[in-house]
Each structure stands twice: as C-alpha cells, then as structure tokens.
C-alpha cells in the first residue's frame, strides 16, 4: 500500500496552480484578466464602477476593476459595517520590463528592424539578453464614440523578438561588468524586411493582422515585452520556482487562493486589492496612491447600510470600520542568497521554505509596526504556520511597496 502525503499533494497543487497563473499572465493586463476569470469561475459578480452598487447582504461577493490592470474583490461579512473592520490583502499586478514606444520601428543595416523601447520599473537589464521575447498588452481601437474607444487585449504567444548580446570578441570586458545603455543596448530585433516593404507602421500592421482590424482603426497601445520561457520548478526535489514576474504575481496568486479557500460567509468583510504601477511609485489612477480603493470600500459600506436599514451615519460607519481593519501588504522578500550572504542582515535574514516574512524598516518603507507584526505573528501561530522576520542590512538600501502608501 502506498502512503499518500496530503500536505505534499496540496503544496504540489498550489505550485502547479501558480505556474499556470504565471504563464497566463505575461503582463499586468493579462494578470488582471486571469484574476477576473478565476473570480467569476468561483461565483464573484462583476461590478461596473460607473453604475450604482447593489444593496449588499452578508455573503455577497463581487469585484470591480480599474483601467484594466487593477482588480478589487470582496466578500461581505455578517456584521454591520461599524462592528467589524475590513480584512484586506493587497498586492500588485505589474513587474519590471520594457514598454514599446510610439513610432517604434527602427531600420538598420541589412534591412533589420528593431523596436524602440523604454524601461519600466527596476529591471535587471542583463537578464533580458538572448531570450525569446514577445509582446503583450492592450490595443485601443476607434469606435463611433470618441469618448468610448474599444479595448482589445493582445497576447502574442510565440517568440517574436530578441535583445541580442554583443559577441565576446567585440567586448572582452563583458564578464568584468559592462555599463548598459537603455536606449542603445536594450532594443529588441523584430525581423528582416523585404526590399519592397517599408517600416512605416510595420508594428501597427502586425497588430492589425493579429486583431483582425484595419491599421487606421488602431488609435494607441500599451504593449510590453515579455519572456516567453514558461514558469517551471527547479531543484533536486523541485523545491524552487524559476519564473519572471514573481514580484509580485506570486503574491497576487496567494491572495486569490486565500480569498477562494473559504467560501463561507465571514464575520468581517474580506477584500483583495490588486493594484498596478507599484514598480513606478503607485501614482496612477490604478495605483495604490489613488483614492479608488477607499472609494470602493466606502461605497460598499453605504450599500450594506442600505440593505440593513441602518439609521447610523454610513460615512461615520465607514471611518469606524477603517479604524478596526487589518491589511496585509503582500510583496516579495529577499531570502538568503548562498552566493551573497554578506548583503543580508546578520540576524534577520529569512530562508526559503521557512514561512512568510514580516518585513520591518526604520525609514517606514513598509506598513509594519510592532502592533501589526504582533497581530500577524499570532495569526500565524494559531494557524500552525512558521514565520520569519526581514530587516535590511544597514549598509544596503532596500525597496518599498504598497503598505506605507495605503496606510
């Protein structure tokens, strides 16, 4: 008789689910689309922010989107708004990469065409060389109403481009560290054109063919490069995950799994907030610095108050609810690197596979304080989940994330 380890099977299923989610989400638009699809599959209704929110009763679950890349989902709790706080998980849909510029085609010697790009976020440039790349994002199309153009998503799944390294024969110092020019060195090759063809609108024509539209109906686009290499497991026991965009799609997936894991009506209202543009400061209408999440949550309280026929001031109820809320800002943390241990704090360095991490920063780049850390650690203890702490090496500047912006 073969013994089956249920815990190992569950972990394996979650890992496979994450790999599928990563591969289906090459850029922020597809990450949001994948998230929306999973929510609808599990009974969440779609709301339109331009329409009146329905009266909400306990157990109702909905989601609303912002600009195609931010998704906010919630499940209404049993208690009246002022009697319980929101329980939120926040993460972000964007990752560092390259955005295609307008008028992107550049004709080179030998009729080779490359595309003009600009770096998005804090990319490690050298990791983009000599990889099979493609395009994904959204395309905006003309309609009869100038104020309401049509949006189409485009995900080219086959390798289409490559950013080619310079051969070592022309760059003998390549392994000694080379300063890269974002404008010169990081432009992907698209192909070789025939003598009879022109580079004029070459990319638009390719987009038009793929979408089945006329080139002149393409008004604009938000297109990005992505690495077509599928996400996979590595390691002797497949204990590691190798993929781009783990920051922060792994936490988007974890937040989704947490929301879907329990479909019972909760005591307090649960919410999952996935923002965009964290990698560039969160200052957009779909970013964490925008008022959209607060507006959605306030409208949620108003709608629930109407359904319960409450006589209290719903706006005051909203503020009271905020004061009782708890938010987890879910982002990636740096585990101990076996080749660069000196970069880590000597006493607060997490290791892979030893539980979630509480990140602390004296400059307040994270939301964590002693009170929040105590609550999270107690939740972990009661759930039987080990946890770790992370603090930056004092000589190494760390990054920031959503938490301190939202709180």
Question: How does the language model describe each region?
Answer:
Residues 1-407:
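N-terminal hydrophobic/helix-forming segments and targeting peptides
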């Amino acid at each position: 008789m073969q013994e089956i380890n249920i815990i190992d099977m569950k972990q394996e299923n979650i890992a496979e689910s994450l790999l599928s989610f990563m591969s289906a989400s090459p850029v922020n638009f597809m990450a949001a689309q994948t998230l929306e699809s999973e929510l609808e599959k599990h009974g969440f209704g779609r709301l339109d922010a331009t329409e009146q929110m329905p009266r909400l009763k306990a157990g109702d679950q909905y989601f609303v989107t912002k600009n195609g890349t931010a998704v906010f989902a919630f499940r209404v709790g049993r208690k009246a708004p002022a009697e319980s706080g929101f329980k939120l998980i926040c993460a972000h849909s964007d990752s560092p990469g390259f955005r295609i510029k307008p008028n992107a085609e550049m004709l080179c010697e030998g009729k080779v065409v490359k595309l003009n790009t600009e770096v998005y976020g804090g990319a490690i440039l050298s990791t983009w060389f000599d990889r099979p790349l493609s395009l994904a994002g959204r395309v905006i199309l003309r309609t009869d109403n100038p104020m309401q153009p049509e949006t189409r998503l485009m995900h080219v799944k086959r390798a289409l481009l490559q950013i080619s390294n310079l051969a070592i024969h022309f760059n003998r110092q390549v392994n000694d560290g080379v300063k890269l020019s974002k404008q010169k060195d990081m432009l992907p090759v698209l192909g070789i054109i025939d003598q009879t063809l022109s580079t004029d609108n070459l990319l638009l024509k390719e987009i038009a063919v793929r979408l089945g539209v006329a080139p002149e109906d393409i008004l604009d686009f938000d297109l990005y490069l992505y690495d077509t290499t599928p996400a996979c497991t590595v390691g002797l026991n497949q204990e590691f995950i190798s993929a781009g965009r783990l920051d922060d799609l792994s936490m988007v997936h974890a937040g989704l799994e947490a929301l879907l894991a329990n479909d019972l009506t909760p005591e307090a209202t649960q919410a999952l907030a996935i923002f965009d543009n964290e990698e560039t400061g969160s200052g957009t209408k779909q970013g964490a610095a925008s008022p959209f999440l607060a507006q959605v949550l306030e409208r949620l309280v108003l709608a629930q108050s109407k359904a319960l026929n409450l006589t209290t001031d719903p706006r005051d109820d909203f503020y009271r609810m905020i004061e009782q809320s708890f938010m987890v800002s879910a982002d990636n943390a740096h585990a101990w690197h076996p080749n660069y241990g000196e970069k880590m704090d000597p006493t607060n360095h997490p290791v892979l596979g030893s539980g979630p991490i509480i990140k602390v920063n004296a400059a307040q780049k994270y939301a964590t304080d002693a009170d929040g850390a105590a609550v999270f650690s107690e939740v972990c203890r009661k759930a039987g989940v080990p946890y770790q702490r992370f603090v930056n090496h004092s000589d190494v500047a760390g990054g920031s994330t959503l938490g301190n912006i939202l709180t």
